[in-house]
């Protein structure tokens, strides 16, 4: 039971991390960032 919950938790965290890193890259427009993630991404990369 515990191992199953741990697997689910790992699976969800991996999805969240990948979506966090992939989503801002695709639609971002640094001249007019739509979201806070985009703005942060653009600040980091100049």
From Swiss-Prot:
Locate the Histidine amide modifications and list their residues: 45
Looking at the record's lineage, which domain of life comes first? Eukaryota
- Keywords for the protein's UniProt record, in alphabetical order: Amidation, Calcium-activated potassium channel impairing toxin, Disulfide bond, Ion channel impairing toxin, Neurotoxin, Potassium channel impairing toxin, Secreted, Signal, Toxin, Voltage-gated potassium channel impairing toxin
Enumerate the InterPro entries for this protein: Bee_toxin
Which cysteine pairs are joined by S-S bonds? Answer: 28-38, 30-42
Quick check: keyword Protein transport in the entry? no
Recorded hits in Pfam families, A to Z, give: Bee_toxin (PF17454)
Signal sequence bounds: 1-27
Q: Per the annotation, which location comes first and is thus the protein's main one? A: secreted
Task: List locations, semicolon-separated.
Answer: Secreted
Q: In which tissues is it expressed?
A: Expressed by the venom gland.
Residue segments, region Essential for toxin activity = 40-41
| Molecular function per GO | inward rectifier potassium channel inhibitor activity; potassium channel inhibitor activity; toxin activity
Query: One cellular component GO annotation, for this chain's record?
Result: extracellular region
What GO biological process, any one, is recorded here?
Answer: negative regulation of inward rectifier potassium channel activity
Q: What else is known?
A: Negative results: No activity has been detected against the following channels: KCa1.1/KCNMA1 and KCa3.1/KCNN4/IK/SK4, Kir3.1/3.2, 15 voltage-gated potassium channels (Kv), 10 voltage-gated sodium channels (Nav), TRPV1, three ASIC, three types of glutamate receptors, and three nicotinic acetylcholine receptors (nAChR).
Function, in words: Toxin with unique selectivity to KCa2 channels. Potently blocks human, rat and mouse KCa2.2/KCNN2/SK2 channels (IC(50)=27-140 pM), and moderately blocks human and rat KCa2.3/KCNN3/SK3 channels (IC(50)=0.6-4 nM), and human (IC(50)=0.7-12 nM) and mouse (IC(50)=28 nM) KCa2.1/KCNN1/SK1 channels. Does not show any antimicrobial activity.
Q: What is this protein called?
A: Apamin
């Amino acid at each position: 039971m515990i191992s199953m919950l741990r697997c689910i938790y790992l699976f969800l965290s991996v999805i969240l991390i990948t979506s966090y890193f992939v989503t801002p890259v695709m639609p971002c427009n640094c001249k007019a960032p739509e979201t806070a993630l985009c703005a942060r991404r653009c600040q980091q990369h100049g």
